[in-house]
């Protein structure tokens, strides 16, 4: 798909803000008919711009009250695919990325409490060639949003 135009971006912004809005409601906001909005949304779905629709649930309501960012330092060099394979089946790891700097990767980890976090960290450290890790526990989230 070519670069999104301003109208596509406005449609995406409306969907991000009001996911349950009808095509007619979105069309009213972006000055298009409901069928025109539907065509654009369908095109963005087919091209992979929109990856799907989901429900966002407050993690605290599900008991995931402890959050940490974990820097991972590995022995020697390790391929990103190996790191992904080591952590993809650990449900507490909600995101993982390779990074620049002294660490090899950073993980975003959720847990029910500190004991659960400690158990998750043990599984994380034992599942790859990890030399050491440094964890930073989140006290409060100040900003949590999607990009504009």
Swiss-Prot record:
GO biological process: response to amino acid
SUPFAM superfamilies in UniProt: Dimeric alpha+beta barrel (SSF54909), Winged helix' DNA-binding domain (SSF46785)
InterPro entries (UniProt xref): AsnC-type_HTH_dom, Dimeric_a/b-barrel, Tscrpt_reg_AsnC-like, Tscrpt_reg_AsnC/Lrp_C, WH-like_DNA-bd_sf, WH_DNA-bd_sf
Disrupted gene: phenotype observed: Down-regulation in strain H37Ra reduces growth and lowers M.tuberculosis survival inside resting and IFN-gamma-activated macrophages.
Keywords, in A-Z order: DNA-binding, Transcription, Transcription regulation
Signal peptide positions on this chain: none
Phenotype when changing residue 104 to A: Reduces DNA binding affinity and does not exhibit amino acid binding
DNA-binding region as annotated in the record: 23-42
HTH asnC-type domain residues: 4-65
Pfam family, one: AsnC_trans_reg
GO molecular function, one term: sequence-specific DNA binding
The UniProt record lists the keyword Kinase: no
PROSITE patterns in the record: HTH_ASNC_2 (PS50956)
GO CC, alphabetical: cytosol
Activation and inhibition: The DNA-binding activity of Rv2324 is modulated by interaction of Rv2324 with amino acids. Aspartate is the only effector amino acid that completely abolishes DNA binding. The majority of amino acids induce a dimer-tetramer or dimer-hexamer oligomeric transition. In response to amino-acid binding, adopts an open quaternary association, which is a part of the functional requirement to bind to non-symmetrically distributed target DNA binding sites.
Up-regulation conditions: 6-fold up-regulated in presence of arginine.
Cystine residue pairs: none
Protein role: Transcriptional regulator involved in growth, DNA replication and damage control. Plays a crucial role in regulating survival and growth of M.tuberculosis. Could function as a global regulator in both the latent/persistent and active phases of growth. Binds to its own promoter region and to promoters of multiple metabolic genes, such as serB2, lat, ald and roc operon. In vitro, interacts with intrinsically curved and non-curved DNA molecules, and with both supercoiled and linear DNA, with higher affinity for supercoiled DNA. Binds to DNA recombination, replication and repair intermediates.
Quaternary structure and partners: Homodimer. Forms oligomers.
Domain description: Contains an N-terminal DNA-binding domain, followed by a linker and a C-terminal effector-binding domain, which is also involved in oligomeric interactions.
Protein's name according to its UniProt entry: HTH-type transcriptional regulator Rv2324
């Amino acid at each position: 798909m070519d670069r999104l135009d301003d109208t596509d971006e406005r449609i995406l912004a409306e969907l991000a803000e009001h996911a349950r809005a009808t095509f007619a409601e979105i069309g009213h906001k972006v000055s298009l008919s409901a069928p025109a909005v539907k065509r654009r949304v369908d095109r963005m779905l087919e091209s992979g711009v929109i990856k799907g629709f989901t429900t966002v649930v407050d993690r605290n309501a599900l008991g995931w009250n402890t959050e940490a960012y974990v820097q991972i330092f590995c022995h020697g060099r390790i391929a990103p695919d190996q790191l992904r394979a080591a952590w993809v089946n650990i449900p507490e790891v909600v995101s993982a990325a390779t990074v620049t700097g002294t660490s090899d990767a950073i993980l975003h980890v959720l847990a029910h409490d500190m004991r659960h976090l400690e158990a998750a960290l043990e599984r994380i450290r034992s599942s790859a060639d990890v030399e050491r890790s440094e964890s930073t526990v989140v006290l409060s989230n100040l900003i949590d949003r999607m990009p504009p």
